[in-house]
Amino acid sequence: MTRKSALIAGTAFAMASLALIANAATAQDQGQSYSADTVSIENFIGRVEIRTGDAAGVSVSITNPGGLVEDPQLRETGAGLAIDGGQSIRNLNCNVRNGVIRIGRRWSGQHEISEYPLLTITAPASLALQLRDAAFQGTAGDLGSLDLEMSSCGNFETGDIAHDVDVNINGSGDLTTRNIGGDVDIGINGSGDVVLGDVAGMMDVGINGSGDVRVADVTGHTDVGINGSGDVEFGNIAGLEIRISGSGEVEAHTMNGPFSARIGGSGDIAIQGGRAEPFEVSINGSGDVRFGGTAVNVTVRETGGGDVSIEEIEGSVDWRRNGRSVLRVGGTD
C-alpha cells in the first residue's frame, strides 16, 4: 500500500469511527425520557408528530433527512421541555402546491418541508403544548392545552384538547382540532383557516384579512371581530358579540343569549334561529343582519343601505333607519 493510499484509508476509518460515535450519542439522547408537563417548540421549520396516550414521560426523536439546517436543541426548563429549532422565521418564502409545502428564504431556493427536521414526540395526553415562531406541518393526539403561533404557512391537526386553546396565525397556516374543554382565543392575520369541534368555554375570534373559522357548538359567550373579508361559521352558540369592518360574514345555526352586532361596510350576519335577549344592531353601510328566531328588547340603528330582518319580536322596540322610526316583524315592513 502506498503512503497516499494508507492516509486515505486511515482518514476514512477515522471518519467512519466518528460517525458511529456521533450516531450512538444521538441515539442515546433521543432515547432519553423527560419528566415534563409542557413541551415548548420555537424557532422551528419542519414537521412535528406528537403521539399522546398513557406515556409516563416525554421522549423526543429527531431526524434531519435533508440536512438543510442544524438539528434542534433540547433543554429542560423546570417542569417543561424546550425544543429550539435555531431558525429565524423572518423573511421566509413559503407556498403550497398540490398539497406539498415548500419553504425557503427570499434570497435562496425553496425546499419541500420533508427535507427539514422531523420531531417525533411521545407524551401523556395531558401535555401542554406550545408552538411559537414556527413554520411547520404536523399532527398531535389528544392534548391538555395548546398555545400555537404559526408563521408564513403550514398546517396542524390535533385530537381533543382538555383545556384552553390560544392560536395566532400570521399568513396562510391552517389548524384543525376536535373538541375543546376550555376557552378559545383565535387571532388570524392573513388567510389562515381554523376548524374546531365543540367549545365548552368562551370564545374570542379576531380576523384581519380573509381568514376563515368554522366551529361546532360553543357553550360560552363568543366575541367576533373581523377587519376585512373573513368568514366565521358556528353551530349552536350562546351569547354573541360581533364587529365587522369590511365584507366579512358570520353565520350560526342557533344563538341563545345576548346579541350585539356592529357592521361598518358590507358585512353580513345570518342566524337561523334561537332567542336573543337583548338584540342590538348598528349598521353603517350596506351590511345585512338576518335573525330567524325571537328577538327580545330590540334596538336597531340602520344608516345607509343596510337591512335587518327578524322572524319574531318580543318586548320593547327602538328601531331607526336613517333617523326614521321603523318596525318590522317576520321580515315584512
Task: Please report, for each region that a protein language model flagged, where it lies by residue.
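Eukaryotic tandem repeat interaction scaffolds
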Residues: G211-V213, T219-I271, P278
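Structural beta-strand/beta-sheet cores of well-ordered domains, especially the beta-sheet scaffolds
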Residues: D37, G248, F279, V296-V298
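Periodic glycine anchor positions in long extracellular repeat architectures
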Residues: G154, G171-G173, G190-G192, G209-G211, ...
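Acidic (Asp/Glu) and glycine-rich low-complexity loops/linkers
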Residues: N23-N170, D174-I188, D193-G206, R214-A216, ...
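Gram-negative bacterial Sec-dependent N-terminal signal peptides
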Residues: M1-A24
